[in-house]
């Protein structure tokens, strides 16, 4: 079955937005703030070099998958948004946790990966550090004061060139 073969080796980017692509409001449209053009260009480079697909793990996903896909297309952002991660309430409904404060973003990503065994490799790009220990090798944190190469990186975070190089390295291994 060719359909199955296409997705057996799928690479996924779990993408947060605020603190990754959106560090300040560069402009506005019907979807809200547009994302920083340099960070979008860095994402484009990642997609071109790895062929990875995007799963939105950001709170922006509360607008729904269809809205995220429409925004991506309307703004001509790189790559393909194929899904959003489950919400905390969905993990609660499944009986996986007793209290909301037990759930981190890493748990939401973990559940998505369990439902999608076709993923061969993944990376998590986020400015928050609430990932699971077994996800650390696949995690690139954009809130980091050690990035001095990008002139845009005045605030010390965002999807800088240095971050994007780390992402590419993870996805190519």
Which residues are covered by each model-predicted region?
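Short, Lys/Arg-enriched N-terminal segments with co-localized hydrophobic residues
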Residues: 1-9
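Catalytic phosphate/metal-binding cores of nucleic-acid and nucleotide-processing enzymes, i.e., regions
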Residues: 10-173
């Amino acid at each position: 079955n060719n359909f199955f073969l296409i997705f057996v080796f799928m690479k996924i980017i779990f993408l947060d937005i605020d603190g990754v692509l959106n560090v300040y409001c560069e402009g506005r449209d019907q979807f809200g703030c547009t994302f920083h053009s340099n960070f979008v260009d860095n994402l484009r480079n990642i997609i071109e070099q790895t062929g990875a697909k995007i799963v939105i793990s950001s709170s922006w996903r509360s607008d729904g998958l269809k809205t995220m896909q429409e925004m991506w297309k309307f703004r001509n952002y790189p790559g393909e948004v194929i899904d959003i991660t489950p919400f905390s309430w969905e993990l609660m409904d499944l009986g996986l946790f007793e209290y909301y404060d037990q759930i981190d973003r890493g748990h939401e990503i973990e559940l998505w990966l369990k439902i999608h065994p076709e993923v061969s490799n993944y990376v998590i790009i986020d400015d928050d550090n609430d990932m699971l220990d077994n996800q650390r090798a696949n995690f690139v944190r954009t809130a980091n004061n050690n990035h001095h190469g990008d002139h845009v990186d005045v605030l010390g975070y965002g999807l800088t060139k240095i971050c994007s190089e780390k992402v590419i390295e993870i996805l190519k291994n």
